[in-house]
Design a protein with these regions (language model features):
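ABC ATP-binding cassette signature C-motif
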Residues: 1-215, 301-489
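Coiled-coil termination/hinge junctions
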Residues: 282-307
Length: 489
C-alpha cells in the first residue's frame, strides 16, 4: 500500500565541512515509486542514504512508516552457504521464494549450496538483491548495483527491478536507468528535485532548462552592462547640469535645478532596474552543471596494426579459462571486449600489457608501442596524491587540472587517497591516463563508480581526439557512442 517518505528541512554537514552538503531539503517520496538517484561523485548520494537509514544525524526530520534496507548488504559470514546467508537476512522467506527470484535474475539455484564468498561479484549482487526484495514492507536503497555486472547481467537486473516497486536506485548507467525507473531524483549543486519519467525524459528536460537559464543569464548580463552605462551617463549629465546653474539668473537656476533633479530621478530608476536584473541573474545558474572539455595527446605510430593476438587462450594453472581468440587492433580503432563475467576479458588485457604470462598462443605488439592504462581496481591507491602522481612520471599540474575538470574538489588534493570514495579514486586513475601521451589506451571498466557528467566529458574527449583504444566497458550508451568495433569473447 502506498505511503510517503517525508523529508522536511533536512540540513547536514560532515565534521569539518565549511559548507553544508544538504541545506533545508524538503521532499515527499511515494513508497511505490521506482526512483533513479543521479548526481555528481562526492555530492552526497550515499550520505543521503545513510541519513535515511539513521546512520547519520541531521537537522530537520525524516518520517516514514516503512523500514529501509541498504544495498550492498554487508554479509556477516561470507564463508557460510548462500542458503544460510539467506536465512539470516530474510528469516521469514521460504527457499522456493528465493529460487523464484533467482530464476528471474538468471541465476542457477545451485548457488544456494555454495559458500557465499565463492560466488562471482555479479552472482553476489543478484543474490543480495533477491534476498532484500523478499523482506516485505521494506523500502530499498540500492547503491550502484551495476558495477560488477556484465551487459547481460545489467539487462536482467533492469528487467527484475522494473517488476518491483519501492526503491531508490543510484546508478550512472543511462540505459540501465531507462530500463527500470519511473521517477528521477536529481542531486544538484544546491537542491534535490524529483521528476516523473525515465532518465532520458529527465535528461532532455534538464538540458533544455540549462540552455534556457544560460540564455537568460546572457541577456541579463547584457542588460546589467547597458543599465550600468546608462546610469553613469545620466548621473554625469545631472551633475553637469547642476553645476551649470551657477552664474545664471534666478529663473534660469530654478529651471536648470529642476532639470537636474529629473535627470537624477531617472538615474536612480535606472539603478533600481540594474539591481533587479542583478538579483534575477543571481537566481539563475545555481544548479547548472558546467563541464570543461578534457584534452588528450595520443601519439602517432607508423604501424597500421598495433596489436595482433593469435590463438591466445588465457590459462589459470592447468585450466584454460577461455577458448582461443584471435584479433587485430589497428591504428585509430576503439575496440570493446564483450562477454559474460569471468570469461577472461580483464585477463586478456593484462596479457596484452605484459602483466599476465600464463597463456598459450602469440601476442605481438608494434615496435616501440607506448601504452597508457586504467586498471579496474583502485585498492592500490594509498597515501599522498602528489606522491602518486610524481611516481607515475607525469606532469603534476596537468594531472591535477584534469582532476579539477572532472569535478574533483581541491580540498581532496591534500587528503590521503584512502579517504577518497571509489568514484574519486577512479577519477585519479582516469586523470593519470589522460595526462599521458600514448599510442594505445587500454581501459578496464573505466566507468565503474563514475558520475554521468564525467562520462559525457570522456565521451566527448574520445570523439574529439580519436585515440586508439582497447576497452572493457558495459555502459551501453557509451559503447554505442565511441566503439568502432566490439569483439565477443
Amino acid at each position: 500500500m502506498m505511503s510517503l517518505i517525508r523529508v522536511n528541512q533536512l540540513t547536514f554537514s560532515h565534521p569539518g565541512q565549511l559548507m553544508p552538503l544538504f541545506e533545508n531539503v524538503s521532499l515527499d517520496l511515494d513508497t511505490d515509486w521506482r526512483l533513479g538517484f543521479v548526481g555528481r561523485n562526492g555530492r552526497g548520494k550515499t550520505t543521503f542514504f545513510k541519513i535515511l537509514m539513521g546512520a547519520y544525524e541531521a537537522q530537520g526530520s525524516v518520517t516514514a512508516n516503512v523500514a529501509f534496507d541498504y544495498f550492498p548488504y554487508e554479509v556477516a559470514h561470507p564463508d557460510w552457504l548462500t542458503i544460510d546467508v539467506l536465512n539470516e537476512i530474510t528469516p521469514m522467506a521460504e527457499e522456493w521464494q528465493l529460487r523464484r527470484e533467482l530464476s528471474l535474475l538468471g541465476v542457477n539455484d545451485d548457488v544456494l549450496w555454495r559458500p557465499f564468498e565463492t560466488l562471482s561479484q555479479g552472482e553476489q549482487t543478484k543474490v543480495l538483491l533477491a534476498m532484500l526484495f523478499l523482506n516485505e514492507g521494506r523500502f530499498l536503497l540500492i547503491d550502484e548495483p551495476t558495477n560488477h555486472l556484465d551487459g547481460q547481467g545489467r539487462r536482467l537486473v533492469a528487467d527484475y527491478l522494473r517488476r518491483k516497486k519501492g526503491f531508490i536506485l543510484v546508478s550512472h548507467d543511462r540505459t540501465f536507468l531507462d530500463g527500470c525507473v519511473d521517477h528521477i531524483m536529481a542531486l544538484n549543486k544546491t537542491s534535490i528535485d524529483v521528476h516523473q519519467g525515465d532518465f532520458s525524459t529527465w535528461w532532455e528536460n534538464f538540458e533544455r532548462r540549462q540552455a534556457f537559464e544560460e540564455a537568460q543569464n546572457e541577456r541579463l548580463q547584457r542588460e546589467v552592462k547597458s543599465l550600468t552605462q546608462a546610469a553613469r551617463r545620466t548621473g554625469a549629465w545631472s551633475d553637469k547640469v547642476e553645476a551649470s546653474k551657477f552664474g545664471q539668473g534666478p529663473v534660469d537656476r530654478g529651471f536648470i535645478g529642476h532639470k537636474a533633479e529629473k535627470m537624477m530621478k531617472r538615474s536612480k530608476a535606472i539603478e533600481k532596474r540594474r539591481e533587479r536584473a542583478v538579483e534575477e541573474a543571481k537566481s539563475l545558474l545555481q544548479d547548472v552543471e558546467k563541464s570543461e572539455a578534457l584534452k588528450l595527446t595520443p601519439l602517432p605510430h607508423w604501424s597500421e596494426v598495433l596489436v595482433r593476438v593469435e590463438n591466445v587462450a588465457i590459462c589459470h594453472g592447468d585450466n584454460v579459462r577461455l577458448p582461443p581468440i584471435s584479433l587485430t587492433l589497428s591504428r585509430g580503432e576503439r575496440v570493446v571486449l564483450d562477454g559474460a563475467n569471468g570469461c577472461g576479458k580483464s585477463s586478456l588485457l593484462h596479457a596484452i600489457m605484459g602483466e599476465h604470462s600464463d597463456y598459450t598462443g602469440t601476442i605481438r605488439l608494434a615496435s616501440g608501442l607506448v601504452i597508457s592504462t586504467v586498471p579496474q581496481g583502485t585498492s592500490h591507491l594509498k597515501g599522498s596524491l602528489r606522491d602518486y602522481i610524481e611516481a607515475q612520471h607525469i606532469d603534476t599540474t596537468l594531472c591535477m587540472t584534469m582532476l579539477r575538470k572532472l569535478d574533483f574538489d581541491r580540498a581532496l588534493f591534500e587528503q590521503p587517497m584512502e579517504t577518497y570514495s571509489t568514484g574519486q579514486k577512479k577519477k585519479v586513475l582516469l586523470a593519470k591516463s589522460l595526462s599521458e601521451s600514448a599510442h594505445l589506451y587500454i581501459w578496464d571498466e573505466p566507468f565503474n563508480y563514475i558520475d554521468l557528467y564525467s562520462r559525457l566529458q570522456l565521451e566527448e574527449m574520445i570523439q574529439t581526439y580519436q585515440p586508439t583504444m582497447l576497452l572493457v566497458e558495459h555502459d551501453q550508451a557509451f559503447r554505442e557512442n565511441i566503439a568502432t568495433r566490439t569483439v565477443n569473447l
